[in-house]
Structure formats: C-alpha cells, structure tokens
Amino acid sequence: YTGGWREARQYLERYRELGGAMDREAYYMLGFSAYMVGDYRDAERNLARAAGPDDKLSQNASYHLADCYLRMGRRQQAMQAFAMASSEGYDEAIGEDALFNYGKLQYELGGGYFNEAINVLNRYLLRYPQSGRVPQVKEYLAAAYYNSRNYDAAYRAIMQVPHPDNDLKAALQKITYFRGL
C-alpha cells in the first residue's frame, strides 16, 4: 500500500514549491515518502539532505539512503551509508541491520576490503552475539580470513559455524591443506 505515502509526498512537494522552509525533518519525510513509493532517485536526493549530524534522524536517513543505493545498483555508496547508519546507536534494530549489511558489502566488494570486512564482521559478533544472523556472519568471516590468507583464523572461524554447507566444508579442506604447508 503506497496511497498514503503518495499523498504525503504530493503535499510536501507542494509545500516546497510554494516556498515553505524545508528543514532536515521535512527533507526526511519527503525522501522517505519517495522511498515508500519506489522513487529511489528522488528519495536519494532528499534523504541525503536529511543525513548529517549524529542523531536518530541521520541514522534513519542513512539507513534508507543505503537501501536506495542498493536498489539502484550503487553498492559502494550503499556500503558507506550503511557504515554511517551502523555507527549511530539510536535505533538498535537499524544499527544491527546496517552493521550486518556494511560487513556483507565489505566482503562482497572484495578488493582491499577483506581486512576491513574482518573488522566489521567481528564487531557485529561482539555487539550482537545472540542474533539469528551469527552463523551467516561467521561464514562471511571464515571466507574473508581465507581470502586474506589468514588460514589459522579462517580455520577457527569455520569451526564455529554450527552447520557448515558443502562450500564451507570444501574451504575447510583447502584451509587445512594450506595450514599444513
């Protein structure tokens, strides 16, 4: 259902067109209403204006901005926005999801990010040890250690995964081999 958001967006756009003062909250509402109706480009423009100081509004704006970037295929920017949303501790659920996605994108984007992915994923495990995502985080962590050629740490990380899949078991065999060299 997007009807209420479409109407809210129309009123906010009309207010802006008539010269109404647009503060961060107004830009957030305009951006969020655009987000809710699937206009991610307009959402990006307005949510970016709402993000800024270290407060709850900025955390929410950064989080939804990150999702806009993901939906537009801009993963690097999404990673940066998730990093912002994860560092601000106002909404715990948003912080947890943002930190997970930040670590996941650090890992998936690869390149020189494996050490940073390891740091972010370890931070997730420290902050949210009871999360249902812990097994998935440990899989990413094991893969990041493997890709960084830290085979001892990769071995320890895989051994902590409760039910490793076949890919992880194959990685464990390779890691064991490389540890023996």
Task: Cite the ranges covered by each PLM segment.
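Acidic, polar-rich low-complexity tracts and alpha-helical solenoid repeat scaffolds
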Residues: Y1-L181
